[in-house]
Amino acid sequence: MVSSTANTSEQQILEWVELNPKLDLPIAGTIIRAKDVEILRHWIVPGLFEGLTFPDVEITLQETQKFPPDQSFVLATDRHAGEAQIGEDGSLKNYSAGQPFSHEQIKAAEPTVAGIMVGWNQNHRWQHFGLDARDIDLIYLGSKQNDAPINTKLGLLGQGSIDRLITFDYRRVYLNNLSMLAGREYRVEIEDAETLFFKEFYEFTSPHNVAGTRFLVERKLDQHADDQVNIYSPTERRVRRYSARERADPVMGSNFTLDDVEAFSGR
């Protein structure tokens, strides 16, 4: 987990969005090392870029690839092209399904608005009904410089150290804006679909001091509403609402708040 993202301000991000680099990216196959990494600054968002500035960094640039979405997503994008709009508050208006904004719309927009369009496109990319992943490792890297490799099983082949390793199961289910459900108003036919965009579940399985901790996150269709978060704590043996104060605190011993983890929401 890269702590530099926690020290990056909104203003730095906005200034980066407004940059218009005159240089072309290096060609595919180029190997970027510490002495060259500065040439990537204009192309990598602040916070992430600083996480790449270490002595042994080695980045091999690859050819861009295409990962075509499901045909239903393509059809929904074409059917509703030009309908979605960005509100004065950055909210997404008049959106049904498919990709909200075309590349042409993004290129023609003022930089800040273009960035918001990209955010909404990311949220509403093709994701089927969601994601179900088991045994995900959260690796908290430390400041000690132990000999390489840190942990071959985890794919950490460089120097450094692990401060903490947490394992969890994760599920997210989308209830609305589903392009493959065109005949059902793009929504799942359950009661929660009246108010929710998605439901998300985390269950931490190790180490023992966090095992059994569970988060249930509900993102509402109302873009101005906060995510509703309920947490089950095995030490308290009860379910409770995640408070506003807790939302502003680092989650599970990381440098990130829960809102950081949940990413762009338009608020």
Model segments located where?
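Solvent-exposed N-terminal domain segments of exported/luminal and surface proteins
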Residues: 1-226
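Acidic, serine/threonine- and glycine-rich low-complexity intrinsically disordered segments
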Residues: 200, 213-267
